[in-house]
């Protein structure tokens, strides 16, 4: 329980897991990871929280024999936009499930020169450009004012485990980087990307905040394993990492259906091309991401 939050606010987790099945790690899947391949003995449970509904049911199971719980951040049909995600409910429900740590898997747009499509990266810093989101559990007149130390938003030990896991399976990855969290759901302008680069951002995403801060409020170690989907707007494509192919078209990760919706349901040839390129980058990166994730989970058991 968090100091200052009344016991009456404690959520009820439907059919709560037994101690034997209590998950060691909570895995949050983003764009490109709507389901967790390799998850065995899967059973889903609906979580109820004082903060409302989660993005979907929690998927309990075993990954490489280790009990874990998985939650698709955008919903299992990728139906929830970044600014509409109930981050408080998601993080709270995973904590109540009994996890010891959270690993967030995300797709990002690369700004730094070495963050090419298909590259994996473990960021170490965040700049928050979001607004209007529910950013804290300590909100309202009946709650105390709490200032968490957020100097280093990602847990150092958990980051090290992810990096060591990549080394153990022979998977190259970038071991640091500043994640710029934009509001979305639109993509960034070329001028904005220039600004983000001047600010020190190495990559762009839309979901790290307030997710990382909420995990810190609950004393949950939190780290991210991200896959670069493509280069941010206005930046040269450069060669793709690994087998991702040429996927450097400006813009960032957007599911095919979202591109169509943004254009009133009609897609032109360029949008089709963008969706295919992003899909190719993520298709190439996801097996490598899952390899690293699985190894990290076994190290945390």
Model-assigned labels for residue ranges:
Residues 119-124, 221-224, 240-243:
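Short, hinge-like loop/turn segments at secondary-structure boundaries
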Residues 2-151:
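Metabolite-binding pocket within alpha/beta catalytic cores that recognizes anionic/polar moieties
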Residues 78-83, 180-183, 200-201:
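Short, flexible loop segments at the rims of nucleotide/cofactor-binding pockets, characterized by
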Residues 153-197:
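Active-site rim beta-loop-alpha module in soluble metabolic enzymes
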Residues 99, 125-127, 131, 163-171, ...:
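Generic secondary-structure signature for well-ordered alpha-helical cores
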Residues 31-32, 109, 126-127, 178-183, ...:
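Glycine-rich beta-alpha junction loops
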Residues 233-301:
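His/Asp/Glu-rich mid-to-C-terminal helical/loop segments that flank catalytic regions of hydrolases
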Residues 187-235:
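A C-terminal functional module that forms or caps the active site or interfaces directly
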């Amino acid at each position: 329980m968090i100091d200052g939050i009344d016991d009456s606010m404690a959520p009820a987790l439907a059919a709560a897991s037994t101690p034997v099945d209590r998950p060691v790690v909570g895995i949050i899947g983003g764009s490109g990871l709507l389901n967790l391949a390799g998850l065995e003995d899967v059973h889903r449970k609906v979580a109820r929280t004082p903060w409302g509904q989660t993005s979907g049911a929690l998927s309990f199971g075993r990954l490489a024999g280790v009990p874990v719980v998985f939650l698709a951040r955008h919903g299992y049909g990728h139906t929830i936009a970044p600014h509409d995600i109930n981050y408080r409910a998601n993080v709270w429900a995973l904590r109540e499930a009994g996890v010891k740590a959270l690993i967030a898997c995300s797709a990002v747009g690369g700004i730094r020169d070495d963050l090419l499509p298909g590259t994996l990266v473990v960021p170490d810093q965040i700049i928050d450009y979001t607004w209007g989101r529910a950013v804290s559990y300590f909100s309202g007149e009946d709650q105390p004012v709490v200032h968490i130390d957020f100097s280093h938003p990602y847990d150092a030990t958990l980051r090290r485990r992810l990096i060591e896991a990549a080394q153990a399976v022979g998977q190259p990855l970038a071991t640091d980087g500043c994640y710029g969290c934009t509001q979305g759901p639109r993509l960034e302008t070329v001028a904005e990307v220039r600004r983000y680069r001047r600010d020190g951002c190495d990559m762009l995403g839309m979901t790290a905040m307030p997710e990382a801060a909420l995990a810190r409020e609950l004393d949950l170690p939190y780290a991210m394993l991200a896959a670069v989907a493509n280069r941010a707007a206005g930046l040269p494509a450069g060669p793709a990492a690994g087998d991702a192919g040429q996927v450097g078209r400006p813009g960032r990760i957007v599911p095919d259906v979202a591109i169509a919706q943004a254009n009133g349901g009609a897609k032109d040839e360029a949008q089709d091309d963008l969706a295919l390129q992003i899909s190719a980058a993520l298709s190439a990166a996801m097996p490598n991401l899952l390899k690293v994730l699985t190894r990290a989970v076994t190290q945390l058991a």
